[in-house]
Amino acid sequence: MDNAIFPNKFKAALAAHQVQIGCWCALANPISTEVLGLAGFDWLVLDAEHAPNDVTTLIPQLMALKGSSSAQVVRVPTNEPIIIKRMLDIGFYNFLVPFVETAEQAAQAVASTRYPPEGIRGVSVSHRGNMFGTVPDYFAQSNKNISILVQIESQTGVDNVEAIAATEGVDGVFVGPSDLAAALGHLGNASHPEVQRAIQHIFASAKKHGKPSGILAPVEADARRYLEWGATFVAVGSDLGVFRSATQKLADAFKK
């Protein structure tokens, strides 16, 4: 049995600034997540912030993705070490941390994923993340194979984005367009010019410090524009959005 889980190919792809197209898993269901895992996306976000997920619902989804080539990214509900530790222990290696506003908060997120002395991650010798103690050199390899993506979604985050991007251990900077729009006074209008300028600034700041940038963009024209602006990892839709759109289209086709 091959118990090798490293190296982290998604982390390596981000470091090489290779475009990674992703999708959001918001339905919190292993079957819908398994279907997305068959589609060929480079990465999938299993959302534990806005979707009804916790460790008990995420484990079946990770199992459903076992044969998938898509990298699994978890968006944690908050930047708390104990939450991140539990996500590590169930098998996540890629983290999207919401509402990061300072370099100190970014550094805390990184430290939460690292074993001492580089960080503060608690040690369990046997858990799902290390295949219950069967992964060779897990403790030696883990720290350098965890990826941290920090989410900028406030004016304070925009103001501090250069320091955040420069933080050691941060692998990428992600824009939360809806919350950013709300924070800038344009709730429900991420297309507002002020929001778009802020997004460009975030992308440019990440690039300045050699870090890839990402964003959620379920509208194709938006996604393509952000890729042209230099975004590296772009989530182009969600299972919920695709399901809602397709079912409405099907119903409309027969009820009109």
Curated annotation (Swiss-Prot):
Keyword Lyase belongs to the record: yes
This enzyme's EC code(s): 4.1.2.20
Site annotation Transition state stabilizer: residues: 75
Cell cycle found in the keyword field: no
Cofactor(s) this protein requires: Mg(2+)
SUPFAM superfamilies in alphabetical order: Phosphoenolpyruvate/pyruvate domain
Function: Catalyzes the reversible retro-aldol cleavage of both 5-keto-4-deoxy-D-glucarate and 2-keto-3-deoxy-D-glucarate to pyruvate and tartronic semialdehyde.
Similarity section: Belongs to the HpcH/HpaI aldolase family. KDGluc aldolase subfamily.
Protein name: 5-keto-4-deoxy-D-glucarate aldolase
Organism: Klebsiella pneumoniae subsp. pneumoniae (strain ATCC 700721 / MGH 78578)
Gene label: garL
